[in-house]
A protein has these predicted regions:
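A short, structured active-site edge motif that brings together acidic residues
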Residues: 42-45, 124-140
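Conserved Lys-Pro-Asp/Glu-containing loop-to-beta segment of HAD-superfamily phosphomonoesterases
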Residues: 2-5, 142-171
Length: 199
């Protein structure tokens, strides 16, 4: 199968921000006396939609407003992500795909404003035809965004390769019919990714 489109996840796949996310979550756990979260512990725990992470970790969502929790995470994340970089060779790979005539897009659980600001900051916006993020900062499922991308491109799902770094990326690809490839240097550890059976 010759792919026509490459669909990228952003956080952890192109942007090397797993450490920043782990620190943001760690601050939230410490505040609530729920223990500590290292980078490796985070990579074992992270699930989408992210509300599941909070529910499974002991956050009392009957007493705490979920939107306030999301806002707290974003405040922490923006503090720690200021020093993040792109993944090694990310620009090289983007350029190679561009040279091959592949059309590239981003589908992200990140809020659209933060996503577009980060893409602009790193100067790589020209590589992407569509940059799709969430309307809010709740890090919900990306399935609807993937379906929206299919509509925008008019391309058959089977002609699209989704490259991500989480089990959820595999789930999204499977749900909408994309092919999927996963990288293990992002938000999920290799053991969890191997269990999906994706390359």
């Amino acid at each position: 199968m010759k792919f026509k489109h490459i669909v990228w996840d952003w956080n952890g796949t192109i942007l090397n921000d797993a450490e920043a996310c782990a620190k943001a979550v760690d601050d939230m756990f410490k505040k609530r006396n729920l223990g500590r979260v290292t980078r490796e512990a985070y990579r074992k725990k992270i699930v989408f939609p992210v509300i599941k992470l909070y529910q499974e970790s002991g956050f009392d969502l009957e007493k705490e407003d979920y939107q306030v929790i999301c806002d707290e995470y974003i405040e922490n994340y923006l503090k720690y992500s200021a020093e993040t970089t792109l993944q090694k060779d990310a620009v090289f790979v983007l350029e190679e795909f561009r040279k091959k005539g592949l059309i590239q897009h981003i589908v992200s659980a990140s809020g659209s404003d933060i996503l577009k600001n980060q893409v602009s900051y790193y100067g790589i916006g020209a590589y992407f035809e569509n940059i799709l993020g969430q309307a809010d900062n709740r890090a919900d499922s990306k399935v609807d965004l993937a379906r929206r991308l299919i509509g925008l491109t008019g391309c058959k799902p089977g002609e699209m390769l989704f490259i991500g770094d989480t089990v959820h990326d595999y789930e999204v690809a499977s749900e909408v019919g994309f092919h999927c490839a996963l990288v293990s240097n992002g938000h999920c550890n290799a053991e969890r990714l191997k269990a999906t059976g994706a390359p």
